[in-house]
Amino acid sequence: MEISKIYFDMDSVLADFKRGVSELCGIVPPDQCPDSKAEDDRMWEAIRDCSHFYDRLEFMPGAEEMFREIYSRYPDRCQILTGVPKPHRGIEGAGEDKTSWVRRKLSPDIPVNIVLREEKKNYVTGPGCVLIDDLEKNIREWEACGGTGILYVSPEETLKRLAEIEG
């Protein structure tokens, strides 16, 4: 298949969100589907209180190398497609911090699309439009709109899946 666009999610694909919650906020991050709303609220409050949280995240293990390999093959087709917390969380600088992180750590030239999670699917333009994301829900929605999803589990698995898609 001809790949027309590759969208990278940021949190837990390129940037180590859980490590950031642990090291920068000093709390154990809840699962992506927390049993307790209070636990989830506590995490978002800690992130809100941590100055420039998203700009201070480290790479996921192997993510920088994975990104560089894909970007070197598709420099004009790679973009970041990352969600920000819902407005009621009060983390107003999240989008600017994510853009700063991308500019500093990846490339000053790569387009950065800042959206709410549920808006990601609006970027699908056809089957050659690939999303690399760690959330199954995002992949399901992306594929339901006609795109191709790669559920992120590791850099190696992502590169393998991308090679399969390329044919």
Give a label for each model feature.
Residues 130-162:
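Acidic, Mg2+-coordinating phosphoryl-transfer loop and its flanking beta/alpha structural elements
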Residues 57-58, 63-95, 102:
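Substrate-recognition element of Asp-dependent hydrolases with the DxDx(T/V) motif
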Residues 113-140:
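Conserved Lys-Pro-Asp/Glu-containing loop-to-beta segment of HAD-superfamily phosphomonoesterases
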Residues 13-15, 20-21, 84-88, 118-121, ...:
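Short, solvent-exposed loop/turn segments at secondary-structure junctions
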